Amino acid sequence: MAATTAAVVAEEDTELRDLLVQTLENSGVLNRIKAELRAAVFLALEEQEKVENKTPLVNENLKKFLNTKDGRLVASLVAEFLQFFNLDFTLAVFHPETSTIQGLEGRENLAQDLGIIEAEGTVGGPLLLEVIRRCQQKEKGPASVEGALDLSDGHPPSKSPEGKSSANSTPSKIPRYKGQGKKKTIGQKPGDKKTSSETSQSEPSVSLSESKSKSSLHSLAHETRIASFLSSSAVDARDSSALCPDGDDVEGDSFFDDPIPKPEKTYGWRAEPRKQVGGLASLSDKPHLRSGLSSLAGAPSLTDPESKRGSTVLKDLKLVGEKIGSLGLGTGEDEDYADDFNSASHRSEKSELSIGEEIEEDLSMGVEDGNTSDKLDDLTQDLTVSQLSDVADYLEDVA
């Protein structure tokens, strides 16, 4: 009975399966399922080929660099920097990507390899910072670092036979002459490192004495040039005044550009009483004038036919006197020769005396003298060389 029921159930399942397949084929669902299954099988086969031929995630350049000693040292410094500041997330990426999960050196081994000595229990910062500091110190002052290493050995500095330090000593800030450095290296070997405290104390005094002597020589030469310039200018002024007494040449000289001091009392011509004659101590570097026409003292008297010629000469002399009076070429009793070299006029006011007036007076007295054609030429030259008398022959107040 059980066998018959099992056979009935099997027949029913077969009929149900056939009916289901026929229904799915008629609706197209079965064909679509078969196509999707075939596509999934092909995709699975393609993905399997890609996974097998896929290149591993390895950086060849980094791998070659880490195989060297310096490369592992750099990677260890970076890892120590991240560990010092507890950058755990960055370390989680750094180690897998560089394939350095194991094999990097610790802080103590790194400090020993780099020659960094740390006191126990004192950690100032990452080792990478100490490496950068040492590089900066070497760039700034290699000489000072070498001196510190020499002093750390505990050996006292040796001295040369002359007691002078070698070229490795600290340079002095006081300027020295070029020849001093050459004298300093005499009798020393190039490889010796010698210093001397006595030399460092004596060198500033020697350089100071040399600078003082140089400055004194410079000032002496400067004073000599000034004295020669002043003497040459005085000689040129005398020559120009003796050769060219007229006012046209005098006006071009900057010596007469100083303002003329106004006197309290002035004197002028008898024919032109309103015209003032200014005084100027411009002839202070010339000899004193004692007489206006001393050169005509013993000249022979003029003849009557030549009196007309003398009057013509008188007019010319008046014109010359007017030019001289307009320039104010007067002298006083006391002359200060130092005033010629001062830019500011510190000249004291002195009594004025017109040279042109004295020319007219002396000429009127000597009109009847002898032939003065040659004497009158000497007259213009004597005006700048001779000195006026202390007492004037004629004075007239100006209204």
UniProtKB/Swiss-Prot annotation:
Residue ranges with Polar residues bias: 163-172
Major subcellular site: cytoplasm
Cytoplasm keyword on record: yes
Compositionally biased intervals (Basic residues): 175-186
GO biological process: cell projection organization; microtubule anchoring; positive regulation of cell growth; positive regulation of cell migration; positive regulation of cell population proliferation
Modified residues (Phosphothreonine): T170
Biased composition (Low complexity): 197-216, 290-302
Residues in LisH domain copies: 70-102
Keywords: Cell projection, Cilium biogenesis/degradation, Cytoplasm, Cytoskeleton, Phosphoprotein
Residue numbers of Phosphoserine PTMs: S152, S160, S202, S301, S326
Region (Disordered) location: 142-216, 236-311, 328-354
Comp. bias (Acidic residues): 246-256
Bias kind Basic and acidic residues: ranges: 259-275
Phosphotyrosine: residues bearing it: Y337
UniProt-annotated location(s): Cytoplasm, Cytoskeleton, Microtubule organizing center, Centrosome; Cytoplasm, Cytoskeleton, Microtubule organizing center, Centrosome, Centriole; Cytoplasm, Cytoskeleton, Cilium basal body
Assigned protein family: Belongs to the CEP43 family.
Assembly behavior: Homodimer. Part of a ternary complex that contains CEP350, CEP43 and MAPRE1. Interacts directly with CEP350 and MAPRE1. Interacts with CEP19. Interacts (via N-terminus) with CEP350 (via C-terminus).
Its biological purpose: Required for anchoring microtubules to the centrosomes. Required for ciliation.
The protein's name in its UniProt record: Centrosomal protein 43
Name of the encoding gene: Cep43
